[in-house]
Amino acid sequence: MTDTETVLVAGGQDWNEIVEAARGADPGERIVVNMGPQHPSTHGVLRLILEIEGETVTEARCGIGYLHTGIEKNLEYRYWTQGVTFVTRMDYLSPFFNETAYCLGVEKLLGITDEIPERVNVIRVMMMELNRISSHLVALAAGGMELGAMTPMFVGFRAREIILSLFESITGLRMNSAYIRPGGVAQDLPPDRPTEIAKAIADLRQPLREMGDLLNENAIWKARTQDVGYLDLAGCMALGITGPILRSTGLPHDLRKSEPYCGYENYEFDVITADGCDAYGRYMIRVKEMWESIKIVEQCLDRLRPGPTMIEDRKLAWPADLKVGPDGMGNSPEHIAKIMGSSMEALIHHFKLVTEGIRVPAGQVYVAVESPRGELGVHMVSDGGTRPYRVHYRDPSFTNLQAVAAMSEGGMVADLITAVASIDPVMGGVDR
């Protein structure tokens, strides 16, 4: 090695100390168990490295990275509008929140937040609240299955199917639809969709009541969840925990109330809290939040008025009032006639807008929305070009997984499953 050479040493930091201590321990007293990444109770490809003594968890570590997609890096090579098709695939159980957070950031950089049409904000809120219900249904269904309650799983996924079918009829896709766009939405609601949404809401009430009847006062369910996965307010504050976990400590923190966006200040709903700081409280919060979401969707239907679904500035937005063609590429006869029927300059402008993208002024912003799992934040940096310089997501699943050790160490292995289920992590959001 010469004086001009640099040697970089990559170490495991505190993990090295754990390994050294493990080598000196009595092998008969401690066992290291890998739970996952292929395990039915880890909510995806989550690896849990557990040190156990008998049935007691003495140490718990999360191993992540098995679902890494490089989405944040890919955004640096795509136009601002194209980014929506990437971010919708991160937390795949709540794609509309990913899309909305991204679009709110772009709109804030462009300075057009106050120009977004009222109909757009109503549609965004409605889609997010429907998505919140579907996400909570998966959380409760999967959590029930992991604890041996199979009937709630069937009820939850059957109810979720109602919402996914609704998404398909509105956006064309059940999941990852890239429906929310900077400046508006991809296309307006079809004429009969408000009636269909109202019917879906009516159909959801029965399975939600059934879910509560099955679990709320179930003695076995309460024995498995009460006083399990305990994390108090001080622990949540120290770890940056948000969402139902934080609200289970009694703190009514909800960005829809504290920092409203998309017109949430115009809707009447309650922030659901609990005071047990345990898995049962988080379960009850999710159950009651679904009913609050139904109230918000009903208010959205009342507030839905005719109007544009994209900002009027054609230098920034694609025409959203045009019907999509049968090939899904947007080249319906109406689309072609409107773009080519005005002038050659209009056609050239539309071509450049699609092929080169919009230019976003240089700057950086942070925006956050209240996702089903907590605060979903986006730190967005623009250098003034047609592509983002950097987009970083603060995904609540990533942050909330820090609580696994605090919730489970000192408890039983079976209670670890309950703790992870109450966190409700989605690995697509963790491994971006």
From Swiss-Prot:
Matches recorded under InterPro entries: NADH_Q_OxRdtase_suD, NADH_UbQ_OxRdtase_49kDa_CS, NDH1_su_D/H, NiFe-Hase_large
Full protein name: NADH-quinone oxidoreductase subunit D
Cellular component terms per the entry's GO annotation: plasma membrane
Record's bilayer topology term: Peripheral membrane protein
MF (Gene Ontology): NAD binding; NADH:ubiquinone reductase (non-electrogenic) activity; quinone binding
Family membership noted in the UniProt record: Belongs to the complex I 49 kDa subunit family.
NCBIfam families, alphabetized: NuoD, PRK06075.1
EC number: 7.1.1.-
Subunit structure as annotated in this protein's UniProt entry: NDH-1 is composed of 14 different subunits. Subunits NuoB, C, D, E, F, and G constitute the peripheral sector of the complex.
Key words, A-Z: Cell membrane, Membrane, NAD, Quinone, Translocase, Transport
Major localization listed first in the record, in broad terms: membrane
Cell location: Cell membrane
Function text: NDH-1 shuttles electrons from NADH, via FMN and iron-sulfur (Fe-S) centers, to quinones in the respiratory chain. The immediate electron acceptor for the enzyme in this species is believed to be a menaquinone. Couples the redox reaction to proton translocation (for every two electrons transferred, four hydrogen ions are translocated across the cytoplasmic membrane), and thus conserves the redox energy in a proton gradient.
Catalytic class of the enzyme: translocase
Pfam families referenced in this protein's UniProt entry, alphabetically: Complex1_49kDa
Keyword Nuclease assigned: no
Reactions mediated catalytically: a quinone + NADH + 5 H(+)(in) = a quinol + NAD(+) + 4 H(+)(out)
